[in-house]
């Protein structure tokens, strides 16, 4: 969901599972319905997708939607008083959380909501996280909240409960990531003596929680696109294969090129974008969005997506926009992208519920249409089926994933460059990177989360590992 980069060590997640917390009774979920038809409530019948009858969900049409909640909470003074009351309730808890009593857990979450008073929410949320020794990073914006936090389960659940006391933020989309037993076994700072119960091997290497104020919780750069008003149809992992195997469906990977390079779904289109804000222009160019009368002229050749042609034969009926199925790592980018496509005239827009991570967790490898590894924004760098840690490492010069083969390339220099950034860096930039790397290796005093810490051991290259094994066998 939310990207958290730092200078030297990315944070860590382990086994991911989706928290399926249903909305309160009689409340309206902005993600229900769409194209999934179930004939029973609470039964065991499998929901059936009816793709041709899919309709985008319009939140504004529901009397109990979040927009109605916003109207009810429009008084800024009342909102601030409500926040202060909730914050005071938590501040009355004077005892410290004994972080020795529970295992660490990481939860990524987001919610699109009309949240103009987001700035007033920053201080009480940050104070609570620090009080409960919850680390991580959170973004607040007029369009909602997006974050990833780490702490013992009790503390993390208290923070999430605090956030959802605001009716507009209730029903967070959550992905839980318990720390693996291996990471827990080597965790040095999971004790009450640690400021945030986060030591050298903690998933997040921050000395405090970062709560930032931004214009968007995920940057697209088009204010008129609002997932609050309408989004596409969510498709569960178990139904995803059926959808993307349909020859009439165009599958689009909404992630960036450094992510798609190491893995994607079979037959998926790669926009080759370097940032999510580039996605709108790619859609406009590739689908040749040009209105002719009341119909959109566009032709998508799935065999070669780069070739999009227009039929000049007036006798042939104009082609309409195709059915779209999109996916990303955890779901937030797809949700906003689906709103964009609906605003551009696309009628059938689907996206993978829970993202790639949920798919890799639930779908057996023998039935999977996923190829390669999935890039993640944490210390694992990549994951495979079953969410097992992947084989990729991270280039600290450009924050891109690199393979063992990439580390054998002449362009690779630890902490400086890799085959993907070597030609893009000037010699001056490389020298500065070498100086920083030397300073870090000798003193560990580079600013940020690793300031004052001794550096980790420089990883051996695959060649060195092979030589070491050969030497030990002689």
Curated annotation (Swiss-Prot):
Outline the segment boundaries, as ranges, of region: Disordered.
Answer: 20-68, 179-198, 432-474
Q: Which residues form the Rhodanese domain?
A: 245-368
Q: Which cysteines are joined by disulfide bonds?
A: none
Q: Where is the active site?
A: 328 (cysteine persulfide intermediate)
Instruction: Give the Low complexity compositional bias ranges.
Output: 53-68
Query: Which HAMAP family does this entry report, sorted A to Z?
Result: TrhO (MF_00469)
The protein's name is: Rhodanese-like domain-containing protein 7
Q: What is the lineage of its organism?
A: Eukaryota, Viridiplantae, Streptophyta, Embryophyta, Tracheophyta
* Gene behind this protein: STR7
């Amino acid at each position: 969901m939310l990207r958290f980069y730092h200078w030297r060590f990315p944070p860590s997640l382990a086994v991911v599972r989706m928290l399926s917390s249903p909305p309160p009774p009689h409340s309206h979920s902005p993600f229900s319905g769409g194209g999934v038809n179930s004939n029973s409530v609470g039964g065991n019948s499998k929901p059936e997708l009816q793709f041709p009858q899919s309709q985008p969900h319009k939140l504004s049409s529901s009397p109990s939607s979040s927009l109605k909640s916003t109207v009810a909470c429009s008084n800024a003074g009342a909102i601030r008083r409500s926040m202060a009351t909730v914050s005071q309730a938590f501040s009355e808890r004077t005892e410290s959380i004994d972080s020795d009593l529970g295992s660490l857990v990481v939860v990524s979450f987001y919610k699109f909501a009309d949240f103009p008073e987001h700035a007033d929410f920053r201080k009480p949320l940050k104070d609570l996280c620090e009080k409960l020794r919850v680390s991580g990073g959170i973004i607040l914006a007029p369009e909602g909240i997006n974050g990833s936090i780490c702490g013992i389960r009790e503390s993390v659940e208290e923070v999430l409960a605090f956030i959802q006391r605001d009716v507009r933020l209730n029903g967070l989309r959550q992905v839980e990531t318990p720390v693996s037993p291996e990471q827990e076994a080597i965790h040095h700072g999971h004790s009450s003596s640690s400021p945030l119960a986060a030591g050298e091997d903690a998933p997040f290497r921050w000395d405090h929680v970062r709560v930032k104020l931004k214009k968007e919780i995920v940057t697209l750069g088009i204010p008129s696109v609002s997932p609050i008003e309408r989004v596409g149809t969510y498709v569960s992992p178990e139904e995803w294969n059926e959808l993307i195997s349909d020859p009439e469906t165009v599958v689009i990977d909404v992630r960036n090129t450094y992510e798609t390079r190491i893995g994607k779904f079979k037959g998926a289109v790669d926009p080759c974008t370097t940032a999510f804000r580039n996605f709108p222009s790619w859609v406009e160019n590739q689908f040749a969005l040009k209105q002719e009368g009341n119909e959109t002229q566009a032709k998508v050749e799935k065999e070669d997506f780069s070739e999009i042609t227009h039929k000049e034969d007036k006798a042939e009926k104009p082609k309409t926009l195709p059915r779209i199925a999109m996916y990303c790592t955890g779901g937030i980018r797809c949700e906003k992208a689906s709103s964009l496509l609906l605003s551009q005239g696309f009628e059938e827009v689907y996206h993978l519920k829970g993202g790639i991570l949920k798919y890799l967790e639930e779908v057996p490898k023998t039935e999977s249409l996923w190829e390669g590894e999935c890039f993640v924004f944490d210390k694992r760098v990549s994951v495979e089926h079953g969410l097992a840690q992947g084989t990729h490492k991270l280039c600290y010069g450009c924050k891109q994933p690199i393979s063992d083969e990439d580390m054998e390339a002449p362009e690779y220099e630890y902490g400086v460059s890799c085959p993907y950034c070597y030609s893009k860096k000037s010699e001056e930039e490389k020298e500065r990177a070498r100086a920083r790397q030397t300073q870090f290796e000798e003193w560990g005093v580079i600013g940020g989360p690793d300031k004052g810490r001794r550096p980790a051991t420089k990883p051996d290259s695959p060649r060195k590992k092979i030589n070491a094994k050969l030497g030990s066998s002689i």
